[in-house]
Amino acid sequence: MTVDERSGYLKPHWPAIKAPRLAGTYQPQPALRIEIPQPHGRLRQRGLPPVTDRVIQPAIAQVLRWMWEPPFHPNRYGLRRMRSAQQALHRAQSEVIKGRKWVVALDFDSVFDRVKQDRLMPKLKAEIQDKARLGLLNGYLKSGVEINGRYEKTAEGVPQGSPRSPLLSNRVLNELDRERERRGHPFVRYGDDCPIYGRRPRAGERVKQSIPHFAEPTLGLKVHVAKSAGVRPCNRTVLGFTCSPRPGHTLKVSEKAVEKVNHPVRGLGRRTRGHCYLSAYR
């Protein structure tokens, strides 16, 4: 069944689709794994759920989002209602204005793919009382993936491509947010991008060395210490922007973001003389 055929199929078959899911007896089908090219030759894995599950999973995510919204740390801005990337940028800018002229960027290794399911499920059981809903979540986590027509189990990770994946990974990262708060680290988080701000390079170095000792054994998240670095805010890109070192600390679009836009634009027309710029867009 295709996405275009979904609406005509769901209406007459909805009672039969809904019943096993409410009873907790539904066995989710594996997601179709695809790979999307990323900059620097990397590949990002995505899991495309079956068409019927694309209706069910947003409903589950909506309930979990309502349940987990209050405990989420206030410095987390990604994938939350009434919060935006612009707010995250202004919060980062305010930390620099306060005199925190050093920022540590921790490089996590594929957060979505590293979530330990055996550590996540006990936490979900403590928070979700509905056994049918809990069983459905567990079934989705254990459903595995289909790669080139071949089934593979998934003992860890929450495949990207469904509405529940960022929510579950953020549930795990919220523990790291609370640990940063306990240590007094000023930070701003949007997804897995989480710059930590300090006043001196020495403080940044301590953060870079200490956070992995919590993230790896407690959450199962691997930090690339060699790739993590402490830099000036003017040299650290946050959501495509840097913070100027000049008075006022204005936000500036990063050179990489500008190049990302300019590169395809250059291919729209040849470099010739004597043409109106409007003709390049026709």
Label the model's feature ranges.
Residues 45-50:
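Conserved phosphate-binding loops in nucleotide/dinucleotide-binding enzymes
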Residues 51-52, 56-59, 93:
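Duplex nucleic acid-engaging cores and interfaces of nucleic-acid transaction enzymes
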Residues 142, 218-282:
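A conserved non-catalytic segment of reverse transcriptases
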Residues 1-9, 33-34:
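Short secondary-structure junction/hinge motifs that connect adjacent elements
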Residues 5-28:
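Amphipathic alpha-helical blocks
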Residues 20-24, 28-35, 39, 71-75, ...:
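Conserved polymerase palm-domain catalytic core
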Residues 1, 62-78:
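Charged boundary/loop elements
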